[in-house]
Structures are given as structure tokens and as C-alpha cells.
Amino acid sequence: MDEIESRIDPEIEDDFRRQWSDFLHHRFTGDIFSPKRRQKSASSLPRRDVRINETLDDLEAMLYAQLLNVSDALESDNKNLSVRANYGTGILSSVLGAELFILPDACNTLPTTRPLAGQGAIERLLERGMPSLTDGLGSRVFSAGELFREVFARYPKIEKYVEIYHPDLQGPLDICELMWGEDLFLSLIHI
């Protein structure tokens, strides 16, 4: 954390954010928007590889893996400084009751969920009403966000310049497909 804090240059990051703000507020006048960090900042520390499956049950490993992304961004000229609770596309479907599907560690791929067993299972899900947002992966997502905020609060530049953005929640049709399975598309045709 100290090393990342020392590598963040407020002048450089303010300029980088200004470029994004200009684009957002229609002040960009070029042909193709491609923000550039004026100066890269290389890490001097060794890195430990973190496997995705390791991060799923270990908040410290999740934080470390996300900070590796921040370190990489500081070494690039165009990446935003950001972290997220990185639990894959099955976050909301797990909150709704779908079983988590974790691939073997060798795949180093984010988890997803298995579909429920047909239309009847979907109907029972709807009858149960609103689930708790801490069901499934929900509690891990909230815990990761809380840890990020707690740790970042001790580092003023990290707190200011490293954005905590929302996890991969997917859209409504994606969630329906995760819950129903590929039969969803045939069911839509036969309605």
C-alpha cells in the first residue's frame, strides 16, 4: 500500500481525470478519445501471483489482486486506477439462489452460477419474494467493498484517486439466462 501511495502523483492523476471529465462534458475536440497519463510510474516491488479462486474466500487476497491492477495502471499511460469486488458474472444470480459454479484453479477464471431446474424453479423463486442482498455472493461483495474503503482511508492519495467501482452485476436478460439457462431463449420464442 505504501508503495502504491508513493507512486501516485496528484498532478498526473488530476490531469488524467481532467481528460475524462472533458470527454464526459463534451469538451474533447479530437477525433478519437484516448486519455493519456503524462508519466508512468513503475513498481519496484516483487509481485506474487494471485489465482482467482484464492480471492473468492480471502478478502486480503482480493484486495491484493485488485491492487496489482492499480499498480499495472500506474505503469500504463491509459488505464484508470480502480478496484472492484471481482466475483464474476454470477453475483446477482447467486443472490437469487442459483448455485455457484467455480471452475478448477488451473482455469484461473471467475465463477458463474448454474441455472435453476426449469420454469417451475423460476416460478418458486418469484413466489419467495425479494431475497436478502447478502445471500449468495452478496455478502462477499459488500465485505470486499467495506475492506477497500477501510484500508484506503489510511492512504490519502489512494482514497482520492483509486476508484471503487461496482462489481459485474450484468443486465436483466443476462441474469435471466444465468437463472433459467439456455432454454430461456426457446421459451421466449414459444410464449
Language-model-detected regions and their locations in the chain:
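Hydrophobic faces of well-ordered beta-strands that scaffold small-molecule active sites
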Residues: K79-A85, K160-D168
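N-terminal basic, low-complexity leaders that serve as flexible interaction/assembly modules and, when applicable
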Residues: M1-C107
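A gly/proline- and charged-residue-enriched helix-loop-helix capping module
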Residues: C107-E146
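Conserved small/polar residues in nucleotide/adenosyl-binding loops
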Residues: I189-I191
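Metal- and O2-centered redox machinery and metal/ROS homeostasis
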Residues: I4, D135-G138, E150, D174-M179
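A short mid-domain helix/strand-loop element embedded in enzyme catalytic domains
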Residues: I164-L186
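Generic structural signal for well-ordered alpha-helices
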Residues: L67-V70, V141-F152
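Catalytic cores of enzymes that engage adenine nucleotides and/or redox cofactors via long glycine-rich
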Residues: V151-Y161
